[in-house]
């Protein structure tokens, strides 16, 4: 079937089949701005697309009744819809409208199609037009216009009537116009069977269509489209413009007049249909391609993102499960090891209990041994007189000393090993505890992480389901949520401000309430005092009114005393206020001093513990020093001939001297710290005592002032009563005097004369008693002299017996101390040997473990360094690739801009050529029907302007749809970020619940503060008790410290004496052995000749001189060791001064 000439001249490729240029245009639309994208898309699609025309049949009558015409030229064939795509440049230029220039020279575009059928003879200007176009230089244009013969033959229409292709408005969603319908109805009245020649029609449409394309491009690039409020979201694309433009042909004069009448009839209907029709595009519509592509890309990105997140979550869950299983296994092993350690701890407790019981038994045995020692003291005194017994005992002791020295050396080694083993066990225990805590913390972290991952999985599933919802509903939900969040945040701020203001108000109210209560108490106290004074004054006034005139002087005196007492009361009140303020300050200082005292007590306890440890270390070092001195003497006596031993001993002496200096300096520092702490404690305790005394004195002063006020008030009332009583007594005594005088007959004997007589009698009696007392005193003095003589004799005998007893007790104590020291040394040596063996074993194990751990750490460090370098190189490669891509994109953008500029330049050239062709055409055409042609041109111009506006609106709406997709992505990302920041939006009910919980917590905190105040008061009482007990213990400690210092001095003195005696005993024993060997003839001379003996003597003297110089140098460098080295240097000097053998 032939193709109609005006309606649907060409159809576009089906199923979106396009060339590679079209695909590149679609792909590049994401990287450039919308104007650049549209122009580039036009150019590439025009060059690369292929053309596949189809024949379409339409129903013109149904379209005329509905009054709608397709603006994009889409054909609906019996309810079926076809996909629309772009044609190449040849078909695009053939489909454009014919265009005429207005008197002002403006170029306009038409909105609707005009299917006219005119015979070939109605176009008289065909040859002239062809010659003009050829002379104007339109060679490239004619090459495009003259296509292959197959394409031109397809454009020849059939004799059947052809109309514009129409379709229902509900399916296609396009806006129709009234004039188009009128022209279409007018075209149906033309005779059928008229066909326009192919070549003329083709060339005519080609020239004007290119002009339309250039004008549309200039309008699109220069202006920014504005979306009117009544236009729907979908508009036809510019790429579909050739479908409309293919339907316009050159009308005849009769057809022009008919079209003008139809336009006048339908101009009123166009305005009504523009705002009333709501356009809804079908999903398969070609205008929806860009929006669907953007939405598809967005959804694909979301799906890929969710897939990656899901894969990461699956991998993380697998790893967490594996780690959890491994942690369970490790936890079980650690628990088993902990049970084993607990068993070992119980066994060690049992061993400790057994050792304590054995110690008690040994102490009991020691007491029994002491009892036996008292019995054997008498026998020991008798045996001392025997020289042979003493010699045998000396030999045994020397042998024992030799053995003990060897054992001592072994025990020292064992002690070192045991200390190292103990340290190792302690470190292993601490490390096991730390590892257990870390494992518990890691298990908790993994559980929380697993829960969080499960929540994230559920959240991602919900997000995946929510992606299918509509964008409009999501936007509304987000806006509502934002408004709710803003309202909640505003309400939260308001409530927090109210809460802060209420707290401040409560504080001010409490302060004002306290001030009012204090003022009320003061006023009540003053009112009571004034009431008491008023009542007292009323009573005194009533009594004074009842008295007579004789007591007026007494009344004046009492009034003056009352005024004085008032002054005293006011002074006492002022003193009381001042003392109350002082009391508060003292109480605060007392609290500060108590806090400082508690801190000092803690520091004192720590320092006492350190002091005990240092003293123990000092004792150990002293014992080591003694043993090393003895070893040095023995080594000097035994190995006088070896030079290596002398060097070793010199090094040993230097090392011991350094250790001794370090220990002495450390001891002096600790003693200084202890003295400083004791001074601080005494200072704080003295301050505390002074504050307590002042507090007690102030309390007593307050009590005294109150008692003085009450006593003064009672004294006033008591004195008034006493005055009355004395007045009555005076009257009574006057009456008695008168009566006595009357009885004596008028002679008055005074009471003094009677008293003189009575006293004279008493004097006589006392004189007699004094004589008797003198006699008895003399007798008692004689007896007392005899008793004192006897007492002096008894005291002399008692002193002699005490001296004898003291001597015996000292002897007893000396022997007991020697026995106890020997036993203690033996036990310590055995214990040290065992400990040193264990320490040596543990030390070896620790060294092996440390070596293995260090190797593992080095390997791990190497692996981590390699991984870090590898990741760094990969990231550098990625950055280089991204930089290259960015450079490529910038170059492509620049090339596209250059192509766009060139295309615009070509468009301007074509416009000039078209203008020349139009001028030639206007000169060729006749003047018949110029009025109708001008009217038609005006209408065409108006429709072209309308078409440009609609195309701009269409492009604007397509961009809005694409931006909506992008906006949706931004909204989802913002929602995800907000959801991560705040998982749960706070509502009014949640806020109310939280407020109730906070109030409940505040009540609990207040209760807790009350309980804390009670406990603080109790602790203060206990602190006072503890401070008093601490003072007592400090006094006891000072006494014990003094005793300890004296005992330590005695111990050092006795130790030096013991070492001296032992050295003398060893020397005497060796001398005795040599003498016995000489006596028996077994002695072997070391030096056979006298000359060798002299040489050996000289060598030894040189070595002694060298040792003496070394000792002098050490004494100069280390003055703290002068006392210890003085004896050694003195012995060496004596040896050097002694003459050699003759």
Curated annotation (Swiss-Prot):
Residues 11-27, 35-55 have a biased composition (Basic and acidic residues). Pfam families: BRE1. GO terms for biological process: axonemal dynein complex assembly; axoneme assembly; cilium movement; determination of digestive tract left/right asymmetry; determination of liver left/right asymmetry; determination of pancreatic left/right asymmetry; epithelial cilium movement involved in determination of left/right asymmetry; epithelial cilium movement involved in extracellular fluid movement. The modification Phosphoserine is found at residue 252. Keywords: Cell projection, Ciliopathy, Cilium, Coiled coil, Cytoplasm, Kartagener syndrome, Phosphoprotein, Primary ciliary dyskinesia. Residues 293-319, 349-470, 526-627, 684-950, 1005-1054 form a coiled coil. It is found in: Cytoplasm; Cell projection, Cilium. The keyword Hydrolase does not apply. Residues 1-197, 251-274 are annotated as: Disordered. Its main location: cytoplasm. InterPro entries: CCDC40 (IPR037386). Residues 63-96, 265-274 have a biased composition (Acidic residues). Signal peptide: none annotated. GO terms for cellular component: axoneme; cilium; cytoplasm; extracellular region; motile cilium. Required for assembly of dynein regulatory complex (DRC) and inner dynein arm (IDA) complexes, which are responsible for ciliary beat regulation, thereby playing a central role in motility in cilia and flagella. Probably acts together with CCDC39 to form a molecular ruler that determines the 96 nanometer (nm) repeat length and arrangements of components in cilia and flagella. Not required for outer dynein arm complexes assembly. Required for axonemal recruitment of CCDC39. Belongs to the CCDC40 family. It is linked to Ciliary dyskinesia, primary, 15: A disorder characterized by abnormalities of motile cilia. Respiratory infections leading to chronic inflammation and bronchiectasis are recurrent, due to defects in the respiratory cilia; reduced fertility is often observed in male patients due to abnormalities of sperm tails. Half of the patients exhibit randomization of left-right body asymmetry and situs inversus, due to dysfunction of monocilia at the embryonic node. Primary ciliary dyskinesia associated with situs inversus is referred to as Kartagener syndrome. This is Coiled-coil domain-containing protein 40. It comes from Homo sapiens.
């Amino acid at each position: 079937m032939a193709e109609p000439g005006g309606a649907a001249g060409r159809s576009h490729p089906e199923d979106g089949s396009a060339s590679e240029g079209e695909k590149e245009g679609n792909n590049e639309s994401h990287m450039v701005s919308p104007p650049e994208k549209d122009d580039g898309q036009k150019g590439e699609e025009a060059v690369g697309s292929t053309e596949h025309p189809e024949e379409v049949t339409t129903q013109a009558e149904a379209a005329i009744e509905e009054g709608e015409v397709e603006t994009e030229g889409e054909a609906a064939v019996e309810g079926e819809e076809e996909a629309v795509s772009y044609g190449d440049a040849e078909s695009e230029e053939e489909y454009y409208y014919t265009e005429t220039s207005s008197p002002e020279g403006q170029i306009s575009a038409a909105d609707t199609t005009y299917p006219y059928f005119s015979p070939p003879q109605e176009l008289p200007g065909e040859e002239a037009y062809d010659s003009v176009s050829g002379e104007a230089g339109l060679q490239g244009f004619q090459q495009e216009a003259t296509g292959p013969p197959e394409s031109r033959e397809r454009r020849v229409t059939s004799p059947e009537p052809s109309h514009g292709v129409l379709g229902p408005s509900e399916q296609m969603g396009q806006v129709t116009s009234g004039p188009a319908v009128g022209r279409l109805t007018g075209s149906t009245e033309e005779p059928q069977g008229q066909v326009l020649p192919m070549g003329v029609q083709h060339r005519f449409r080609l020239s004007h269509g290119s002009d339309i394309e250039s004008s549309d491009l200039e309008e699109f690039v220069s202006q920014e489209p504005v979306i009117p409020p009544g236009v729907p979201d979908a508009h036809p694309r510019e790429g579909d413009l050739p479908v409309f433009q293919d339907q316009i042909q050159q009308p005849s004069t009769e057809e022009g007049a008919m079209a003008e009448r139809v336009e006048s009839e339908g101009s009123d209907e166009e305005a009504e249909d523009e705002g009333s029709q709501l356009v809804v595009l079908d999903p398969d519509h070609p205008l929806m391609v860009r929006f669907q592509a953007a939405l598809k890309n967005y959804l694909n990105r979301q799906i890929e993102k969710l897939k990656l997140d899901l894969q990461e979550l699956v991998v993380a869950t697998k790893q967490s499960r594996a780690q959890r299983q491994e942690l369970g296994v490790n936890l079980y092993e650690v628990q088993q090891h902990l049970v084993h350690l607990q068993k070992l701890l119980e066994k060690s407790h049992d061993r400790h209990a057994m050792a304590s019981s054995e110690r008690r038994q040994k102490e009991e045995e020691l007491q029994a041994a002491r009892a036996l020692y008292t019995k054997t003291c008498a026998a020991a005194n008798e045996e001392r007189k025997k020289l042979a017994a003493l010699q045998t005992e000396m030999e045994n002791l020397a042998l024992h000393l030799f053995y003990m020295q060897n054992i001592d050396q072994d025990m020292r080694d064992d002690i070192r090993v045991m200390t190292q083993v103990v340290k190792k066990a302690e470190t292993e225990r601490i490390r096991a505890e730390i590892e257990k805590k870390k494992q518990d913390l890691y298990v908790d972290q993994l559980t929380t992480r697993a829960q969080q991952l499960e929540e994230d999985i559920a959240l991602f599933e919900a997000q995946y389901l929510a992606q299918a919802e509509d964008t409009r509903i999501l936007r509304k939900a987000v806006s509502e949520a934002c408004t709710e969040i803003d309202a909640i945040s505003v309400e939260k701020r308001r409530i927090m401000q109210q809460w802060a203001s209420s707290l401040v108000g409560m504080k001010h109210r409490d302060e004002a309430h306290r001030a009012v209560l204090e003022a009320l108490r003061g006023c009540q106290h003053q009112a009571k005092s004034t009431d008491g004074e008023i009542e007292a004054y009323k009573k005194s006034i009533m009594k004074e009114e009842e008295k007579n005139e004789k007591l007026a002087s007494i009344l004046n005196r009492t009034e003056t005393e009352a005024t004085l007492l008032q002054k005293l009361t006011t002074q006492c009140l002022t003193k009381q206020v001042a003392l109350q303020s002082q009391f508060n300050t003292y109480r605060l200082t007392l609290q500060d001093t108590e806090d400082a005292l508690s801190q000092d007590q803690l520091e004192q306890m720590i320092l006492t513990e350190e002091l005990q440890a240092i003293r123990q270390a000092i004792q150990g070092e002293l014992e080591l020093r003694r043993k090393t001195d003895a070893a040095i003497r023995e080594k000097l006596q035994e190995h006088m001939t070896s030079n290596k031993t002398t060097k070793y001993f010199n090094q040993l002496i230097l090392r011991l001297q350094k250790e001794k200096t370090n220990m002495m300096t450390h001891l002096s520092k600790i003693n200084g710290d202890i003295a400083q702490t004791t001074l601080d404690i005494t200072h704080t305790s003295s301050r505390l005592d002074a504050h307590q005394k002042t507090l007690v004195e102030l309390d007593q002063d307050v009590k005294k002032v109150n008692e003085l006020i009450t006593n003064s008030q009672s004294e006033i009332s008591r004195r008034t009563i006493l005055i009355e009583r004395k007045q009555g007594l005076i009257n009574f005594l006057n009456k008695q005097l008168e009566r006595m005088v009357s009885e004596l007959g008028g002679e008055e004997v005074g009471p003094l004369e009677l008293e003189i007589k009575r006293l004279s009698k008493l004097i006589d009696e006392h004189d007699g008693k004094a004589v008797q007392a003198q006699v008895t005193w003399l007798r008692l003095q004689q007896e007392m002299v005899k008793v004192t003589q006897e007492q002096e004799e008894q005291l002399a005998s008692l002193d002699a017996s005490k001296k004898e007893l003291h001597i015996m007790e000292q002897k007893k104590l000396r022997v007991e101390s020697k026995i106890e020291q020997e036993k203690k040394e033996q036990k310590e040596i055995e214990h040290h040997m065992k400990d040193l063996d264990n320490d040596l074993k543990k030390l070896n194990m620790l060294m092996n473990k440390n070596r293995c751990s260090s190797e593992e750490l080095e390997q791990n460090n190497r692996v981590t360094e390699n991984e870090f370098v590898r990741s760094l190189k990969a990231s550098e490669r990625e950055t280089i690739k991204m930089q290259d891509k960015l450079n490529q994109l910038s170059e492509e953008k620049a090339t596209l801009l250059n192509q766009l500029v060139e295309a615009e330049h070509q468009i301007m050239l074509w416009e000039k050529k078209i203008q020349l062709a139009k001028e030639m055409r206007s000169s060729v055409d006749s003047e018949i029907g110029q009025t109708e042609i001008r009217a038609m041109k005006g209408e065409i111009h108006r429709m072209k302007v309308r078409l440009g506006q609609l195309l701009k609106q269409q492009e604007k709406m397509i961009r809005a749809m694409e931006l909506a997709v992008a906006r949706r992505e931004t909204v989802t990302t913002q929602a995800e970020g907000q959801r991560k920041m705040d998982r749960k939006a706070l509502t009014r009910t949640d806020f109310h619940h939280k407020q109730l919980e906070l109030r409940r917590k505040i009540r609990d905190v207040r209760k807790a503060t009350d309980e804390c105040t009670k406990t603080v008061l109790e602790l203060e009482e206990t602190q006072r008790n503890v401070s008093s007990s601490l003072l007592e213990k400090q006094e006891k400690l000072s006494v014990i410290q003094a005793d300890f210092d004296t005992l330590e001095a005695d111990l050092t003195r006795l130790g030096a004496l013991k070492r001296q005696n032992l050295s003398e005993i060893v020397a005497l024993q060796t001398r005795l052995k040599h003498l016995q060997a000489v006596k028996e003839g077994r002695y072997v001379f070391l030096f056979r000749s006298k000359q060798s003996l002299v040489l050996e003597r000289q060598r030894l003297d040189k070595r002694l001189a060298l040792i003496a110089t070394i000792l002098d140098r050490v004494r100069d460098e280390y003055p703290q060791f002068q006392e210890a080295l003085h004896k050694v240097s003195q012995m060496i000097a004596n040896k050097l001064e002694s003459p050699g053998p003759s």
